[in-house]
Every structure is written in C-alpha cells, then in structure tokens.
Amino acid sequence: MSRVIVKGLPIYLKEDRLRDLIEKRLTQKHQSTDVQSYLSDVKLMKNRDGESRRFAFIGFRDEEDAFDCVNYFNGTFVDTSKIEVSMAKSFADPRVPQPMREKRREALKRLREREELLLADKKDSQKKQKSDSNNDGGKKHDIDAEIAKNKQLQEFINTMKPSSQVTSWETVQSSKTQGEDEEAADDEVGEMSSNPLLSQALALKGNSRDADEDTDMFKLPGNESDDEYVSLNGGSNNANTDEPEPQMMSLDTFDTAGPTSTDDMAKDEAVSDLDWLKNRRVRIKDGADTPVSKQQQQPDTEQQQPEETEVETSQESEEEKSLKKIRETGRLFLRNILYTATEDDFRKLFSPYGELEEVHIAVDTRTGQSKGFAYVLFKNADNAATAFVELDKQIFQGRLLHILPADAKKSHKLDEFDLKNLPLKKQRELKRKANSAQQTFSWNSLYMNQDAVLSSVADKLGMKKSELIDAENSSSAVKQALAEASVIGDVRKFFETRGVDLTKFAQLKNSERDDRVILVKNFPYGTTREEIAELFLPFGKLQRLLLPPSGTIAILQFRDVPAARAAFSKISYKRFKDGIIYLEKGPSDCFTRDAQGDELVESETDIQKATAKEAKISGADLLEAQSLPAADKDDHDDDDDDDDVQAGPTVSIFIKNLNFSTTSQQLTEKFKPFNGFVVAQVKTKPDPKQPGKTLSMGFGFAEFKTKEQANAVISAMEGTILDGHKLQLKLSHRQGTSTTNASSKKKKKNQGKIIVKNLPFEATRKDVFELFSSFGQLKSVRVPKKFDKSARGFAFVEFLLPKEAENAMDQLQGVHLLGRRLVMEFVEQDPEDVEQQIEKMTRKVKKQVNTTKIANMRNSGKRKIDLDEDDENDGLQG
C-alpha cells in the first residue's frame, strides 16, 4: 500500500501547499532536489460547491515513503489543525464504508427486482384465468340446457333478481297475457339481462357451431319458436307481417356509429333492458374470429418471454460481463497509471498470475511521454481473469489501478491457408520475419558480414579485395579470420569509447534485452550513418546512433519502446541494397552514459551535416582519433588534461566505509568534479525481506581514465566525510567495467593452453597454426582426429607465455573460420599436488571400468547393473 489519507486539514488549505509539505519531507529523506518522481498523486477532496472536505489522498511511488509519511505527519499540526494520517484503503477492502450513491443504487435494484417479481406473478395469474375461462367455455351448452329444462330454476332465478333489474308489475301482467311461449321468451331475456354469466353464455353460444354455418342471427334452443325469435329482433308479434325483419347491426356499422347512441339509450329510462341488449349485441362468426384472437394472444405471450430473458440478461452484473470478455480476449486495459511507470513495473505486477505475452504502454509520439494507460496481454485468458479480480481497484504506485477488459489485439498474420498458396521460399521468408521478435541469434552479438569485413580491411590498407584474398592460396580462410579479428578489435574500441558496456553482450539473455536498443547487422560496406537513420527515423525519434568507422555494424537506441518494436518488426530481414538486414535486440543497461555530441540524432538534417563532416578518413586519422577519444567527450578547459587521456582500461578506486543510505547518485556527485571521472557506483545486493529492492553493501567503486588522475583523487578525498561516514580509498586491482570479460575468472588459472571448439572439419593443423601464430609464439598445436583421419571438431593450442594466450583470446573472440564461429576456453590446469593427480587418474580409470562393464552386460543380455560409484579410495586398495 503506497497511498495515505490525511484527515482534519484546514478548510482553506490548497493542494499546492499540501504538496509542498510532502515534498519537503521527501527532500529531507532522499537528500535530493528532484523529488517529484517519488510523489505520484496529491488529491484534495471537494464537494459540489468546490469547498474542501478537509481530507486528502497522497500517493507515493514506493511503500517505504508512504509509511514514512504516516510516521512523520500523523498527529502533527497544520497551522492550528491537528491532522490524522493513515494508510488508505482500496475499494476492494471490505472495511471501506459504502457510499450513499451505492446504497441508493442497491435500493433501486432491489425495488426493481420486487416489481419484476410482481409483474411475473400478475402475468401468471392472467394466464391461469385465461386457461380457466377456456375451460368454462365447454360448459355453456350444459348451463343453457339445464335452465331450459327446469322451469323451477327459471322461476328461482327471476325471483332472486335484484330490485333494480325487476320490471314493473304492469309489464309483468301484460307479459302474462301473451301466452306461455311469449312468457318463456320474456323470462329467458330477463334472466339473461339479470345474470351476467348467463348473458355471456348466450352471447358466446354460437361459437360451438360448425364453421360452415354463416348466419347473422342467434339460434335459440329447440323448444322456442320462430315467433319468439322475431320478437327478440324487435319486430311485430304477428308472424304473418310482410314488413322486412330488422337485421342485427354489423360490426362495421357499429364501429362507424360509435357507442354514443347506445350510451344515450342506457341513460333513457323509457328504454327497456331488452331493447338495450339488442343494440349491444355483436355477431361473432363461428370458428373464425375467436380462434384467430386466441392465436394472436398466444404469440403475444410467446413474444413476451424473450423480453423477460432480455431483462434478466441486462441485469447481469458489470463484473460478470467484464470477466466474460476477458476470458475471450485475455487482454487487460489499465488506466490511471503513473506517467513515469515502465513496462517492467507492470511485468513484475502481473507476472505472478501467469505468463505474459505483451505489455504495452501508450506513448505520445510528439513528446515521448506516457498517455496514462497501458495494455497487458496474457498467454492464458484464465490468468488474465484472475489478475483482473485480484488487482482491479487496488493501489499501485500510489494510484488506484482501474482495470477494464480490452478488445482483442488486431493481428495481420497470415494463416496456413494463405501461406500454402505461396511459394515455399516466400513462406519461409514470411515465417522468419513474423518470428523475428522472438528469435535469438546463434552467432555472437558483434556478428559482421564477411564481405563487409574484407571490404573494410582492404579499404583501410589501400588495396583491392582480390589482392587481399587469393583464391588459389590455401591460407585465404586464415587471412579472412585475421581480418575479421582486426575489425572486431576496432569496433570494440569504438564502442567502449562511446559508453557501451561490452560485458553485457557476453552475458546476454532473453530476459535482459532492451526493446529500445537494436543492433543492425549484415549491411554492406560503405553504408553511411545518414542511410541507416533514414531507414529507422520514420518509426520514431532516435536517441542514439553509433556507427564505427569500419562501417560493418551499428547500434541505435529509440526514445520510445513502441516505435522501436514497430521498427524491429518492419525492418527485420528487409532487403537493403544488395543484402538483407539482420536485427537483434541489445542488452539492457548496455550504455554507461547518456548520448553526447555526434551520437545524438535530432532530425534528418542533422544526420546530413554529420555525415558531410565524415567524408573520407585515412587509416592514420582513424588510429589518431582512436588513440585520443576523450578530446571529444570532455569539455575541460585545461588542454594538458586532454592530452593525458588514454583509451582502453580504466582505473578503479575502491571506496569503503560508506553509509548504507548513500546512493550511487550521491557518490557520483561527490567524485564528478574531478578530471577524468568516468562512473561511480555503490555495490548493492537483493533485499531478502522486500523482493525487487536492493540493499547497500557499504562499499563502492569510482573509475577514472588514468592512474595519475585516480591517485590524485585518492590523495584529495582520503578521510573526507560523506553522510556522516569517513571515506577510505585505495586503488582497486581489477580493470574497469569497460574491459572486463566474462572469462576473467578463467584467466587467473591460465597456463597458456587454449581449447578451440566448433572448429570446421575441413580445417587442418596448418590453418590453426597460422591463425594463432600471429598473436605469439606457439608451444604446440594439436588437432585430434577420428579413426578415419577426419577432424573431431576441436583443437588444443598452447602458447609459450600465458600473456600471449590471453591476447589471442581477446582478439579472436567471435572470429569465424570457414563460416564457423570459434569458441575458445582455457584448458583446466593440471593439479600440482600428487594426491590430486592420483585422484584424477582414479576417476578416469573408474569411468573406463564402468564403461567396460556396461558394454559386457549389454552384450551378454543382462539388464541388472550397479552404477553406484564406490569410495574414492577403492582404486588404491589392493
């Protein structure tokens, strides 16, 4: 946790003053004027009116600074207000109180869920009612038949009518004089008007008829006559009348007429219930309208079901949606990150959750600054989901890290279907270009084109390549190897004087590569600095470009990582002039200083000016320039100091009794004013309690160009005080970092004998002798052979003096003989003690005996063998 909360601030306090208070404490702790990199965020909380809420959040890059802020400021006073400082909590912390906005949101969510449950219950009840009404439709005929048969039931129904629906006595008396049939009809109509269930049964009674019948009249039960039907339609009671019978109002007429007339009739007291009922009747065709309406209702209910599922899916939480997308893409989008955060910071943060495929920080191409967001791509999408759950809304470098699901990365790779239609040669080229970013080269980092090497040496000697290499001479391969060794030596010296640490190339690993540093190889001799810059400048700004005078290899450094990646993927294996360019990512921290002078690349015009000054240089000028490289690097006013500077190994001063809080930057500032200063460094070791951090070991080194300058510094700085400690200085017996080789440990045991591995099978003893005799007097050269007299691929070379062997090792590192890179090591020295010699011989004899036993067991068919080694003294006992 690197974020703190400050409570109890004065209401008038501004962010600027709060920032000044924190920076003042950081300056005291780190003893540096530039403390902005340690402070990541200062946020004073305000209300809607812009007034301070009297608390603030402060973010630090390191947790150590956050704890120091809590211990230092907690309980102190700002003006007259006592402040309370404590570690801030993230949103994922369960102890954080829920804000009112979230409470309202959850209350609305619960209310919405209850409403949906009520709507669902209501729909279920409606469906149940519809199903019950459909079941009641089959009982209509039974009800009508029962009422028609039972006269007592009819009388009971009429008697139980409410008073508002009973007609006057005069109407009843007149209805009795019309006959029994007419009375039955009146009773039927009165019964229908008084009982709503019976009225519905009579209105829907026609639905049970056959579909082929089409009539506009209701069909009454069989015990009723046509006269009663005529009176029901409102005609005369006389059946012999010639007047046309009034027909039932059609649906169209009813729709156009509207309900106004029927409403007036309902208000008119003179209108009887029978007349009102006749005007309210609507004809329903048998088997036509009702099924259609049912069919229309059923799809409606079916269409409502998907809507319900849509509501349910829309209520899916945002976190579940995010996890679903992350499991598909495996890519995370990070925002609210620190602008000075690097890709390595996020690799350390996310690598514990799974293997990462890519980490990309968006960079502004104009300014080179981060845009404040990044992308992280996992090889396994499940690991990305786990990282999202664990790290979202957590505090990282003093800021609340906000993680969102990112879209899938756009890829322009050709699949196998597209590749199979191309020629085989084109397929291999495309695959090699696509895998160039993950490819590691088998040759040495300072690999050079052999033709460019010969052209450079021939131009340096002022002769033609045909004169340098004679095709009829058997020693042409040796001459080519010696020429390459000479060029490699010149390139090493050039890079060392330009601040390149060549020991990083010898210890190069995939995990230690820097995406911004690119080694450009295999371009033809004569390629200028301007041409290389024009090739890479379209992808982004170059921070450094180094091209040795030999013109066989170049090292460039981009300002931005995305630009370097784009250039690497686009230019790798690209045809350039009459060759193909090879690119390799350089090691991290391979530069010991910042770019200076002509190493800087600002624009194409600057490249043109620089190359115009490098027109043609003779071999003497090159040697003179290499012997005095410091004249261009230092800006001292004293000319005598510049003349004393020498190229090659630097002289180191061992500094002990350092304060454990002293940093390399403080040590550099202490020794930087002296002439000839190169670099100062405090030795550190990993902190076992805090992974990723280091602890000072209490001593360090300071390098100077000459021994005289180092002695002057020792006499001047011996006994001085730094961070309360008295410094103790003395000359170091090791060489500078610029010339330290990976095989330095082996050189201590050097006896002048070298084993040469990866030797071409075509190479003879004469070739090996001619190659190594150029560096000293040889004592013996041995090339082991097989039983058929062919070489075994290695050789032993023994020099007369160990110093000559070391010189040969340095000069021939990375040299190719007949197309193979020579790998050389010092042979393990023979033991001087007699007991050690006997022990060595014993191990050798035991190994031979075990080999013989295994062969005999295999030939005899036995499978059980004992491979356990006996005691070491068994071979000495009789």
From Swiss-Prot:
One GO process term, biological-process aspect: rRNA processing
Ranges of compositional bias, category Low complexity: 295-304
CC terms in the record's Gene Ontology section: nucleus; ribonucleoprotein complex
Record localization: Nucleus
Molecular function terms from GO: mRNA binding
Primary location: nucleus
Region (Disordered): 118-143, 159-269, 287-323, 732-751, 852-878
Comp. bias intervals (Acidic residues): 180-190, 305-319, 867-878
Residues annotated as domain RRM: 2-90, 330-408, 516-588, 651-734, 752-829
UniProtKB keywords: Nucleus, Repeat, Ribonucleoprotein, RNA-binding, rRNA processing
Skewed-composition ranges (Polar residues): 159-177
InterPro entries linked: Mrd1_RRM3, Nucleotide-bd_a/b_plait_sf, RBD_domain_sf, RRM_dom, RRM_MRD1_RNA_proc_ribogen
A Pfam family assignment: RRM_1
Role of this protein: Involved in pre-rRNA processing.
Family: Belongs to the RRM MRD1 family.
Designated name of the protein: Multiple RNA-binding domain-containing protein 1
Species, as recorded: Kluyveromyces lactis (strain ATCC 8585 / CBS 2359 / DSM 70799 / NBRC 1267 / NRRL Y-1140 / WM37)
Gene from which the chain derives: MRD1
